[in-house]
C-alpha cells in the first residue's frame, strides 16, 4: 500500500520510514539484562585501551630511534627494500617502515637489506660498505615478536 501511494507523483517517497526498524534494537536492550551487562562490560574495557595504545606507541618510538641510529646511513637503492619510500632516514619514515613491518609486509626483506656490509649513503661521510649491522636480526625479530604476539594480543584482550 505504501509503495503504491509513493509511486504517484503527488506524494513523497516514504521508504525512509524503514530506518525506524533500528529502534527495535533499543527496545531489545532495555528488556535483556544479560545484553545490558555485556554492553556495560564492553564500554568499561575501553578505559584500558588508551594505556595499551600508549604502550604500542612507546614501542614504535623506541624502535624508530634505534633504527635511525643503526640503519639510517644505508644507501637508498630502488632494487632493495631500503629505498626512498622505505628507510630509516627520518623519524616519520622510520615509523612508516616499522608500521609496514608490524603488519607483516616483507619485514624479512627489509631485515636482509639492513645487514652489515651494505653500501652507505654518499652524504654520510662513511666509506663505501661499512653500513648496516648484524644487529638487524635481533632488531627485526624482536620487533615482530613484540608487535605480533604481545601487543596485538594485549590490544585484542582489552577489547
UniProtKB/Swiss-Prot annotation:
Annotated keywords: Calcium, Calcium channel, Calcium transport, Disulfide bond, Glycoprotein, Ion channel, Ion transport, Membrane, Phosphoprotein, Repeat, Transmembrane, Transmembrane helix, Transport, Voltage-gated channel
UniProt subcellular location: Membrane
IV repeat residue numbers: 1-159
Membrane topology qualifier: Multi-pass membrane protein
Site (Calcium ion selectivity and permeability): 105
InterPro entries noted in UniProt: Ion_trans_dom (IPR005821), VDCC_alpha-1_subunit (IPR050599), VDCCAlpha1 (IPR002077)
The keyword Lipid biosynthesis belongs to this UniProt entry's keyword annotation: no
Record topological domains on the Extracellular side: 6-13, 72-135
Cytoplasmic compartment segments: 33-51, 156-159
Keyword flag Cell membrane: no
One cellular component term from this protein's GO annotations in UniProt: voltage-gated calcium channel complex
Modified how: Phosphorylated in vitro by CaM-kinase II, PKA, PKC and CGPK.
Superkingdom: Eukaryota
Family annotation (Pfam families): Ion_trans
Carbohydrate attachment residues: 13
Catalytic activity reported: Ca(2+)(in) = Ca(2+)(out)
Molecular-function annotations in GO: voltage-gated calcium channel activity
Stretches that traverse the bilayer: 1-5, 14-32, 52-71, 136-155
Quaternary assembly: Multisubunit complex consisting of alpha-1, alpha-2, beta and delta subunits in a 1:1:1:1 ratio. The channel activity is directed by the pore-forming and voltage-sensitive alpha-1 subunit. In many cases, this subunit is sufficient to generate voltage-sensitive calcium channel activity. The auxiliary subunits beta and alpha-2/delta linked by a disulfide bridge regulate the channel activity. Interacts with RIMBP2.
Domain notes: Each of the four internal repeats contains five hydrophobic transmembrane segments (S1, S2, S3, S5, S6) and one positively charged transmembrane segment (S4). S4 segments probably represent the voltage-sensor and are characterized by a series of positively charged amino acids at every third position.
Family: Belongs to the calcium channel alpha-1 subunit (TC 1.A.1.11) family. CACNA1B subfamily.
Free-text function comment from the UniProt entry: Voltage-sensitive calcium channels (VSCC) mediate the entry of calcium ions into excitable cells and are also involved in a variety of calcium-dependent processes, including muscle contraction, hormone or neurotransmitter release, gene expression, cell motility, cell division and cell death. This alpha-1B subunit gives rise to N-type calcium currents. N-type calcium channels belong to the 'high-voltage activated' (HVA) group. They are involved in pain signaling. Calcium channels containing alpha-1B subunit may play a role in directed migration of immature neurons.
Annotated protein name in UniProt: Voltage-dependent N-type calcium channel subunit alpha-1B
Originating organism: Gallus gallus (Chicken)
Amino acid at each position: 500500500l505504501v509503495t503504491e501511494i509513493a509511486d504517484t507523483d503527488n506524494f513523497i517517497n516514504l521508504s525512509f520510514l524503514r530506518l525506524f526498524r533500528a529502534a527495535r534494537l533499543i527496545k531489545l536492550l532495555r528488556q535483556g539484562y544479560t545484553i545490558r551487562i555485556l554492553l556495560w562490560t564492553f564500554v568499561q574495557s575501553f578505559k584500558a585501551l588508551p594505556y595499551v595504545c600508549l604502550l604500542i606507541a612507546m614501542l614504535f618510538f623506541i624502535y624508530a630511534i634505534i633504527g635511525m641510529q643503526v640503519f639510517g646511513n644505508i644507501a637508498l637503492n630502488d632494487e632493495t627494500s631500503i629505498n626512498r619510500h622505505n628507510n630509516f632516514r627520518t623519524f616519520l619514515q622510520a615509523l612508516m617502515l616499522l608500521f609496514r613491518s608490524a603488519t607483516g609486509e616483507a619485514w624479512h626483506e627489509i631485515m636482509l637489506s639492513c645487514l652489515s656490509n651494505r653500501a652507505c649513503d654518499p652524504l654520510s661521510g662513511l666509506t663505501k660498505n661499512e653500513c648496516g649491522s648484524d644487529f638487524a636480526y635481533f632488531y627485526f625479530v624482536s620487533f615482530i615478536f613484540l608487535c605480533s604476539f604481545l601487543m596485538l594480543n594485549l590490544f585484542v584482550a582489552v577489547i
